[in-house]
Amino acid sequence: MRAVEKAHFLETARHAVLKAVEFVAQSTKERPPRVDRHDLLGKEVKLDIDQRLSELLTYQLNETGIAVISEESPASHTIVDEVVWLIDPLDGSYNFLRSAGPSAVCVALLEGLSIQCGVVYDLQSNRLYSGGRGIGALCDGVPIAVSTQSRIESALVYTGVPSRMDMTNPQSLGRITNLLKHAQKIRMIGSAAVSLVNVASGIGDVYLEEAIMPWDVAAGIAVVEGAGGLVHAQLTSRSQPIRVVAGSHELVELLSAE
């Protein structure tokens, strides 16, 4: 996809995300998230607002004529169109419910299995991130760049333990143990998208997570790539969990080799 096309779609995504953010602001004013009805599916939390944001974003993005795959719409997970929007209407739902940390509205554009561009709105900091490979990355209109940190011993690493992670898998657990042993600092903040944009901004140095869903990370990956970062993510499906390593080139190469 050409840079000019990416820029056009990125503006469309920004517009849709800002409409969703307006809805969040109005909804939380009328009905605080602590009293929202929610469903617990295993370790997953689903709020009313997840579904309502999904419907709003889908309506906005459908105007482009491009199909939308949403985390909150299982029927959309089998869409096979070459170009699709991939959205997580509210990444970090549990944080949102409990006011426990960051959450985000996320929209990405995919061509096949290639992430073209994405937008992440951090609802806690009220910052809008956007970007994609070859078109740069911005935070509230200001260019951002990943860090140049090359030593894991000096690195701030973002990670998480998603609900789909196999806690009996010694390889996955071993990677987390190695991070705890060698990284200078580890942060688990409950939102993959915000973790990724923090890495894109140079706040953190690298992000690593096992068994994370593509809609949780696609928009954030686009921003990291736009910010000059390296991403290793074996995306084989738009709706199956993947392992992601993203950030400074040296650290991604190091952690991907494990």
Question: Which role does the model predict for each range below?
Answer:
Residues 1-90:
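N-terminal subdomain of lithium-sensitive/metallo-dependent phosphomonoesterases centered on the IMPase/IPPase/PAP
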Residues 67, 117, 205-206:
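Short, Asp-centered acidic motifs that coordinate Mg2+ and/or phosphate
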Residues 71, 189-191, 234:
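Conserved beta-strand termini and adjacent loop/short-helix elements that scaffold enzyme active sites
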Residues 81-125:
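Glycine-rich active-site/cofactor-binding loop and its immediate structural neighborhood
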